[in-house]
């Protein structure tokens, strides 16, 4: 069995911008006073997940590789850019901090819907949560003190509501990736299994 998922890679320049945003947020007073409050995503591991699959056997991987190649040719490249700060579950009960996406979202949604349909055909259960395009910046630490976390969440909410304009770079999505995730003591490591190009000549 391999732990796998389907995702879009994020360009190096965009990762640098997201790292700069993380560094800026870390300077907010509650986060500066208690840096361990949030577990920040390593920007080297950033990607836009279209469908997490989990344990995948050899036969399923073969079906997925063929299916992804077949569906990729039906989708043209499209552009995305980052948008405002957001969170799951809520600012009063913060679990995940993320930056949203804008741009050609309909093309992104169509691609994700095809990936979801393929996953079901291969035998995976339907995804319970509606697809919400985002890039995860941080997760709440398991031992986070609630009063301090509430204070940090309030600062983050203000940043999100101020919606300070960033000079985000647009990025072109031209490939779909089938990725293996290997969990270890230093966190997850990712290995690309298959890359499927989105053709320009549709």
Sequence positions of predicted segments:
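Histidine-dependent nucleotide/RNA phosphoesterase domain, centered on the 2H-phosphoesterase fold
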Residues: 1-202
